[in-house]
Amino acid sequence: MTVPIAIIGTGIAGLSAAQALTSAGHQVHLFDKSRGSGGRMSSKRSDAGSLDMGAQYFTARDRRFATAVKQWQAQGHVSEWTPLLYNFHGGRLSPSPDEQVRWVGEPGMSAITRAMRGDLPVSFSCRITDVFRGEQHWNLLDAEGENHGPFSHVIIATPAPQATALLAAAPKLASVVAGVKMDPTWAVALAFETPLQTPMQGCFVQDSPLDWLARNRSKPGRDDTLDSWVLHATSQWSRQNLDASREQVIEHLHGAFAELIDCAMPAPVFSLAHRWLYARPAGSHEWGALSDADLGIYVCGDWCLSGRVEGAWLSGQEAARRLLEHLQ
């Protein structure tokens, strides 16, 4: 019997590792506490259509990742997004075009991880609470007390604070990962029946509780019945208001949006708030991935590199590369 490799987390990093390992002929089994794949790359189904509440777009600078993106494009899972960009600074809103190529999943960010997952075996709504090693193999324990295993190796592909809690069997790794701080982000979606009278489709914001806003319907393949917008608060504001109610967050960020936009703003017909507790790493690292190859445990995620989507994908590739190298 072939003993599979366990991968905890079905965001870009975990799925990138899974693809690399299955391409090399290995069996994997994925676990995720959510109901679907994607992590911060997931889209939220709502009365206002599919909303990208997490990652807004991504770029491809590394040659290997750019090749993967071109494959996704050929398969119809991603498209270029060319928004009319603005900048808000010192109380002034001004056009801010640039040459950056931006990619989005189509018809939502979830399309990418759904395609990457394919028909790989996965246990959703399964929160792993303990990772422990027997004489030969690894086993996982979930929040319901159910045991999963055996597994030959374990890859943990979650935000750093969640990974730390699963590394009791690898104290050296745990101490490194425990030092990684991640910043929160409050995200709010607002939808309007009548489109806002502004050409703006994306905006980088300074001197405000807001950090970024995007006109969701301007992305390829999105539902355009309503004029939906996604607002991201700054890490600082999000941390200061971490335990605020969703209603308070919506009210405050809606107000900040109304202050910066250059047109009248009616009352939204739909609003939604989501708190990303671990939205992005507070600093960048150059680890690629972390591992204790002798134990057979590996850790990857965007926080091992740049904190970007590309960083997550590359980190998953690196975790798989190290595992395969050790098997040789």
UniProtKB/Swiss-Prot annotation:
Record carries keyword Oxidoreductase: yes
Pfam families, A to Z: Amino_oxidase, NAD_binding_8
Binding site for FAD: A13, D32, K33, R40, Q56, Y57, I128, D302, V309
Cofactor(s) needed by this chain: FAD
SUPFAM superfamilies reported in the protein's UniProt record: FAD/NAD(P)-binding domain (SSF51905)
Catalytic reaction annotation: 1,2-dihydro-beta-NAD + O2 + H(+) = H2O2 + NAD(+); 1,2-dihydro-beta-NADP + O2 + H(+) = H2O2 + NADP(+); 1,6-dihydro-beta-NADP + O2 + H(+) = H2O2 + NADP(+); 1,6-dihydro-beta-NAD + O2 + H(+) = H2O2 + NAD(+)
Keyword entries, A-Z: FAD, Flavoprotein, NAD, NADP, Nucleotide-binding, Oxidoreductase
Binding site for substrate: Y57, F58, T59, A60, R61, S96, P97, D98, T185, R308
InterPro entries the record matches: Amino_oxidase, Bac_renal, FAD/NAD-bd_sf
Gene Ontology MF terms: FAD binding; NAD binding; NADP binding; oxidoreductase activity, acting on NAD(P)H, oxygen as acceptor
Enzyme Commission number: 1.6.3.5
Reported function: Catalyzes the oxidation of the 1,2-dihydro- and 1,6-dihydro- isomeric forms of beta-NAD(P) back to beta-NAD(P)+. Has a preference for 1,2-dihydro-beta-NAD as substrate. May serve to protect primary metabolism dehydrogenases from inhibition by the 1,2-dihydro- and 1,6-dihydro-beta-NAD(P) isomers.
Matches recorded under PANTHER family: FAD/NAD(P)-BINDING OXIDOREDUCTASE FAMILY PROTEIN, FAD_NAD(P)-BINDING OXIDOREDUCTASE FAMILY PROTEIN
Assigned protein family: Belongs to the bacterial renalase family.
Name this protein carries in UniProt: Renalase
Taxonomic lineage of the native organism: Bacteria, Pseudomonadati, Pseudomonadota, Gammaproteobacteria, Pseudomonadales
